[in-house]
């Protein structure tokens, strides 16, 4: 009898804990989506710093800082896509496709590909050789970021 009571109490405690987790997730969902959009915009800014160097609009130090930060932000991508955070970004232009979560391993593999291409971009940036940087930049854009966005990001038509 006492064992049944303990199991019942344990079950109730687990149910309450699970319910509280769902409430926290619901409360945090909006913030996670905002954080996700901010991370993607930060990556865009990082790429802009590299593009600026290629186009003679800024110096190599800014391009290097951007390429370095891009590598760091790539590692944070899984953190801003936890389950239960489906939905449009705050500006309403994009939303992750359900495949982010249903094909999580492939999503992470795409991120790994993009991260490797970001590392190759940093190597190129450190040379200062603009044609080499342009090649690495284009590869990252098409086969890294672009490939992931093509498979896992939906543009919201207004």
Show which residues each predicted segment covers.
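Absolute protein N-terminus
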Residues: 1, 26-27
